[in-house]
UniProtKB/Swiss-Prot annotation:
Pfam families: I-set, Ig_3. SMART domains: IG, IGc2. One of its GO terms (cellular component) is plasma membrane. The gene is Lsamp. It is found in: Cell membrane. It comes from the Eukaryota. This is Limbic system-associated membrane protein. It comes from Mus musculus. The modification Phosphotyrosine is found at residue 94. Keywords: Cell adhesion, Cell membrane, Disulfide bond, Glycoprotein, GPI-anchor, Immunoglobulin domain, Lipoprotein, Membrane, Phosphoprotein, Repeat, Signal.
Length: 341
């Protein structure tokens, strides 16, 4: 705040004398401002504010005051604040310059002028605007599906920032309002992802921060395909599941767990698993079970590896020859002599 400094005791009589000449008893600190009302000056935090005051003649005695006291009396600076100085572009100007304005500088400032005829005052109200700044936001959170979630986003600024929440999905659904809290009741897996908090006012660009919401849910088999195989060749069964955390996979046959050994190979990545038979034999045909599990649940799917029988070449030739003869007989019917009795 632009304040004042106590004068040296030795100089106190001289200072008091100056003030008595400059600020006569009963001087009103009100908005008569040379026939004008109070001026409002709006400045953004960190910028420089210039409070204008122009006198009628060089002999006028001038002072700047605010709610804290005297800032300048004539050319004598009473304020300790190094940001404050006089600005005189010409002989009749007695403006006040405040550098790096902050919120505590906001308020009423009075330019008091003592002329040869009567005292006058010019009052200026300094308004300090502050860009929006998010001061507190929820940390990333992990919850189970069906839980209630509350996200918090608090911001400072002048004017008061408007808070907007948005779920960062392809649809980009926004939750409009001046609410610092976003409540999600019975959250679903589709509502997981990043949530963006935006604090905005008219001073500058918005301040934006994000919160990541992870929703845990039990596994669900999304794809499982049976497969046909040929004896002596390689064949695979594949199983896919959706879950958070990512599921662990196991393979079974006839209630016996299968491991990667004896010509069988299991490969599992996040969300999918495969069982590969490197050299199919008759004993490999049959039913298999894919099991997907995480800390919230377990599910399974049944798959079948079945035989693919190839047709032999002679059989196909016989069919073709038969069809050829049959068609020929239709085109050229045989002539048969009647039986003699």
């Amino acid at each position: 705040m632009v304040g004042r400094v106590q004068p040296d005791r030795k100089q106190l009589p001289l200072v008091l004398l100056r003030l008595l000449c400059l600020l006569p008893t009963g001087l009103p600190v009100r908005s008569v401002d040379f026939n004008r009302g109070t001026d409002n000056i709006t400045v953004r935090q960190g910028d420089t504010a210039i409070l204008r005051c122009v006198v009628e003649d060089k002999n006028s005695k001038v002072a700047w005051l605010n709610r804290s006291g005297i800032i300048f009396a004539g050319h004598d600076k009473w304020s300790l604040d190094p940001r404050v100085e006089l600005e005189k572009r010409h002989a009749l100007e007695y403006s006040l310059r405040i550098q790096k304005v902050d919120v505590y500088d906001e308020g009423s400032y009075t330019c008091s002028v003592q002329t040869q005829h009567e005292p006058k005052t010019s009052q200026v109200y300094l308004i300090v605007q502050v860009p929006p700044k998010i001061s507190n936001i929820s940390s990333d959170v992990t919850v189970n599906e069906g839980s209630n979630v509350t996200l918090v986003c608090m911001a400072n600024g002048r004017p008061e920032p408007v808070i907007t929440w948005r779920h960062l999905t392809p649809l980009g659904r926004e939750f409009e309002g001046e609410e610092e809290y976003l409540e999600i009741l019975g959250i679903t897996r589709e509502q997981s992802g990043k949530y963006e908090c935006k604090a905005a006012n008219e001073v500058s660009s918005a301040d934006v921060k994000q919160v990541k919401v992870t929703v845990n849910y039990p596994p669900t088999i999304t794809e499982s395909k049976s497969n046909e195989a040929t004896t002596g060749r390689q064949a695979s069964l594949k199983c896919e599941a959706s879950a958070v955390p990512a599921p662990d996979f196991e393979w079974y046959r006839d209630d016996t767990r299968i491991n990667s050994a004896n010509g069988l190979e299991i490969k599992s990545t996040e969300g999918q698993s495969s069982l590969t038979v490197t050299n199919v034999t008759e004993e490999h045909y049959g039913n298999y079970t894919c099991v997907a599990a995480n800390k919230l649940g377990v599910t399974n799917a049944s798959l079948v590896l079945f035989s693919k029988y190839a047709k032999t070449e002679p059989d196909s030739m016989q069919v073709i020859e038969f069809l050829h003869i049959d068609l020929k007989s239709i085109r050229h019917p045989l002539k048969v002599n009647p039986i003699q009795k």
